[in-house]
Amino acid sequence: MVGNDWVNSYLEAILAAEPGIANSKPPGTGDSKSSLLLRERGHFSPTRYFVEEVITGFDETDLHRSWVQAAATRSPQERNTRLENLCWRIWNLARQKKQVEGKNAKREAKREREREKARREVTAEMSEDFSEGEKADLPGEIPTPSDNNTKGRMSRISSVDVFENWFAQHKEKKLYIVLISLHGLIRGENMELGRDSDTGGQVKYVVELARALGSMPGVYRVDLLTRQVTAPDVDSSYSEPSEMLNPIDTDIEQENGESSGAYIIRIPFGPKDKYVPKELLWPHIPEFVDRALSHIMQISKVLGEQIGGGQQVWPVSIHGHYADAGDSTALLSGALNVPMVFTGHSLGRDKLEQLLKQGRPKEEINSNYKIWRRIEAEELCLDASEIVITSTRQEVDEQWRLYDGFDPVLERKLRARMKRGVSCLGRFMPRMVVIPPGMEFHHIVPHDVDADGDDENPQTADPPIWSEIMRFFSNPRKPMILALARPDPKKNLVTLVKAFGECRPLRELANLTLIMGNRNDIDELSSTNSSVLLSILKLIDKYDLYGQVAMPKHHQQSDVPEIYRLAAKTKGVFINPAFIEPFGLTLIEAGAHGLPTVATINGGPVDIHRVLDNGLLVDPHDQQAIADALLKLVSDRQLWGRCRQNGLNNIHLFSWPEHCKTYLARIASCKQRHPKWQRVEFENSDSDSPSDSLRDINDISLNLKLSLDGEKSGSNNGVDTNLDAEDRAAERKAEVEKAVSTLAQKSKPTEKFDSKMPTLKRRKNIFVISVDCSATSDLLAVVKTVIDAAGRGSSTGFILSTSMTISETHTALLSGGLKPQDFDAVICSSGSELYFTSSGSEDKTALPYTLDADYHSHIEFRWGGESLRKTLIRWISSVEEKKKTKKGEILVEDESSSTNYCLSFKVKDPALMPPMKELRKLMRNQALRCNAVYCQNGARLNVIPVLASRSQALRYLLVRWGIDLSNMVVFVGDSGDTDYEGLLGGIHKTVILKGLASDLREQPGNRSYPMEDVTPLNSPNITEAKECGRDAIKVALEKLGISLLKP
């Protein structure tokens, strides 16, 4: 290429391909929101592709010269106004691209400044010297290659000598492990990899991981939870509720129980009879969580009867894969109180950074990928996970470091303190563990070739797939360059074909085979996939590659090993030229078959190459480098043989048993916090209320002696506001904490506590009132209306769910003429407290509520306590400093409303409060994990444990007391506290009372994504009542199929 001539040739190609470009608008101007790049879903524009080639491939100076040259043409016959205008526009786009790069640099600098500030604040609070023991410990790092020579045979890690040793040490354990992968089409056999962008390497990974874990000694059962798909356009196997995975071949006989092994469990959720992409699954995650929770509870009970001595066998861990499953796993981990493990596979922030650098507007990115919802889910995974498993160090150092919730420097400091037994002051960071994905090599036999490349076993019949590929070639004996990937722009197959077509020596020495999924008709594929295939076909024609390139339309998953063997037989090379490859499982597969590799320098292949040392790394953007690397390997037989041998020698380090041993060792290091209560059957219980089962435990009762006269003299809304009232509230708080402390010291899971079920267990309908009103009087009116509409009876129960404390709730109920006994349970302090109502007590002045102490132990995971409170106080000072208001304090600590698991603050001016996402970001930067909620019309900020919420409290009732969530009806308003969205989705039914709204709708946002990315507003489980009236509520309940008591 020489300067302007090549630029002009590109521009002429653009004009010939799509004349209408001259009338288009650059991205980000006017009404145009189009991108210059290929979209994974959507219309492919050759024009945009060529423009991007120009912008990324040439200096701005060259582009400017092209415009000057076009504008300087004097002859009317030679002058082309369209070319002149086009040159100017593309030059302008190049300048905009530089501006985007500048913005990206500023954003990265701002992120580093914020992170450095957080580090300084944490270091100041931690006076310990961090210098000792802070060097990074990289657990699970891949061992260095050994010098053993296996003479062309791989070392099989699953052989008897190694596996027996592991089996002897772990055979007594009986673990239950849950894996979750929601999107794509998942089945154990004949996986349709490459069918769409959701059914790729992750599907293969999770299925093989489940199968390998199920074959490990000490693991009794593995459940891989995914979505049940009953759509007519997919195979019926994806609608089967369960599928048992065949175990991997081992020479060890293991004891098999009735429910042991590995299973794919398909949970129905989301649109029925429709297969939807992962971007549209977000609103349906709460439904999946509820149904998955019921399944896990059922299996835990079954396993308890088989191997647990009658007590439930809880999962030792729940492992989420990708952001959508990670979001689900965090909620399930909190509901069950078991350790969470997470694997990102592909991370949203990294994708966002790449797309922003390419000049795509944020609105378009979020519209296509739901990127903000995805990123928040990944941040929640960092909050809730004990272990984050990655495939490479690159993922940790360059991708996870982009998140608010992970700082490699701070993580090492906290780990150093933990090793020395020093308190981390309420700060937590998940452990990043590098464990490469595995393969099972027991059945793989590399193709044996002699020094001349001839087959040592000519009598063996060739597999059918060989002839299917060889029919494309005019000279099938030439070495085969093999690429196996979806026809996706990210896989960079177009550049590969260009490199092959433009390198005559390479074309003379080798053939090219492209395995790009399965297809019948190109026009039936997605626009992106079809565009890539059409581009490749045009390049084949352009370079006259007929007889040199194979593009078979169909292959089975079982054919893939044979395809690798064919490439090795011809002394070929496997190539993965993707722009970015998170890991590169196909590179391991190729190495296992004795096939040297050429791979991208971006991502996981770097780590794989460091271990296998069986090929070359190239810049995927450098077409000439790709051609040179391929030519070098196919032309140098000594290099080819050395790379083949290195791969075979070291491939055992990527075996599934090796992966699982490291995996299980890391899981064993997690602190097990399973529920400690004794589960019993309630069906034959005769109790009528929670108080019947709790009445004899006097230590649990909250003997708070209240002055009823004093309470009645308070404000109209039932909440004390004067100084005397605050003093009384502080005294009451101290008495509550003393009662809870006494409970923790004296109460144990006695038979009387657990021998009878709460009344809620036997309710046919349970109505949960979670309406957040601007005034307490409005809330009381709603409560009375709902109770009146639903009716009272033994089959009907009520739960009040609120942000108020128990004493505030009690005072409000009395002021409205309601009795505590009208409710079976009360959820207080935004979900951090759970009480059952009690009808009898020897002390007539005691509050008639019984604290569920097990709930506190259930939600205390990663609770920062006093360190969190100090950080919040500092944050309040910084907010007030930024606002510099003359009105005085914006936010003050409310000790009277705070409890051991809820830090409460009074908001003096809600309009001056920063967005909730700013507070979350601050906490995550400081490694403090919490759930912050703006409530009570914006007048209060409640900060509670990270996995506590009003919606999670309902799931706790299922886990602790076996209460069916589908029997619940949750009443909410048009809007509410900032935890409002969590109350809408799930298998429970929801009634939205129109006309009831909190003024929080005017507050800074709780999220950066729309409500439709959170909850399915068109769900049949959600309906609206036109007004908060008795008749309107009855009509809404009838729509939901709720039968009410007749008056």
Swiss-Prot record:
Which biological process terms from the Gene Ontology are attached to this UniProt entry? Answer: nectar secretion; pollen wall assembly; sucrose biosynthetic process
The record's listing under InterPro entries reads: Glyco_trans_1, HAD-like_sf, SPP-like_dom, SPS, SPS_C, SPS_pln, Sucrose_synth_GT-B1
Q: Which UniProt keywords apply?
A: Glycosyltransferase, Phosphoprotein, Transferase
Q: Please give the activity regulation comment for this entry.
A: Activity is regulated by phosphorylation and moderated by concentration of metabolites and light.
Keyword Ubl conjugation assigned: no
Pathway it acts in?
A: Glycan biosynthesis; sucrose biosynthesis; sucrose from D-fructose 6-phosphate and UDP-alpha-D-glucose: step 1/2
Name the residue ranges with Basic and acidic residues bias.
101-123
Q: What is its EC number?
A: 2.4.1.14
Xref: Pfam families: Glycos_transf_1, GT-B_Sucrose_synth, S6PP
Q: How does it assemble?
A: Homodimer or homotetramer.
Protein family per UniProt:
Belongs to the glycosyltransferase 1 family.
Disordered: region residues: 101-153, 712-731
Q: Which Gene3D superfamilies match?
A: Glycogen Phosphorylase B (3.40.50.2000)
Q: Example GO molecular function term?
A: sucrose-phosphate synthase activity
The UniProt catalytic activity note for this protein reads: beta-D-fructose 6-phosphate + UDP-alpha-D-glucose = sucrose 6(F)-phosphate + UDP + H(+)
Q: What is this protein called?
A: Probable sucrose-phosphate synthase 2
The free-text function statement in the UniProt record for this protein reads: Plays a role in photosynthetic sucrose synthesis by catalyzing the rate-limiting step of sucrose biosynthesis from UDP-glucose and fructose- 6-phosphate. Involved in the regulation of carbon partitioning in the leaves of plants. May regulate the synthesis of sucrose and therefore play a major role as a limiting factor in the export of photoassimilates out of the leaf. Plays a role for sucrose availability that is essential for plant growth and fiber elongation. Required for nectar secretion.
NCBIfam families given in the database record: sucrsPsyn_pln (TIGR02468)
